[in-house]
Amino acid sequence: MPGAIVGIYGVQRSGKTLIAYKLVKGLQQACKQQGIFLPVYTNLYSPRDPDFRFVNSMDELPLDLSPKVVLIDEIYNGCDAQDYRKLKDISIFINTLGKQNCLFVFTSIDAQMVYNRIRNQMNVVILVKSSSTHIHYRFLYLNTGKYTDFVVEKNAALFEDVYYDTNFIPLDFDWEMKS
């Protein structure tokens, strides 16, 4: 199976990390019900979630054909579209991703802050907007040109079983492939 890319965009505190976490966690749980363990490698600090493996470097990701999810929160911290020194390593990662059994999910404030080769290969874009009472999500399916809107109410139930540290600011992800 070739890799797939989901980009999630929204302003700070809009709910983009929440939907990324719930999407990946839901996929992981669906696989678990089928008897498949789906590892998640992420820069989200989730010490209470044993199924999420904290990584902060390309070298920490296994480059094999086993199914996996890579979730990078605030991707522009390390994958800036203007940082030309890192583009070679990011290009290698994208080429590797295309040949792997990997779902790559990332969040960003703005699409222009993300390297264009990642943007151009996205399969799904999720736009996030938040009010004091609701979070609005628009899922854009780039292969079909269709979209679906979801609105969720902000309440305690929405944040049940959410184990990442919402106050943790992701470090710059190291895109260099040393090995």
Spans of model-derived segments:
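P-loop (Walker A) phosphate-binding loop of NTP-binding proteins
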Residues: V11
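Hydrophobic anchor at the beta1->P-loop junction of P-loop NTPases
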Residues: I8
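Phosphate-binding P-loop
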Residues: M1-G3
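Post-Walker A helix-loop "phosphate-sensing" segment adjacent to the P-loop in P-loop NTPases
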Residues: G26-Y41
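Conserved lysine of the Walker
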Residues: K16-T17
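Conserved P-loop NTPase "ATPase switch" module shared by AAA+ and STAND
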Residues: L63-R85
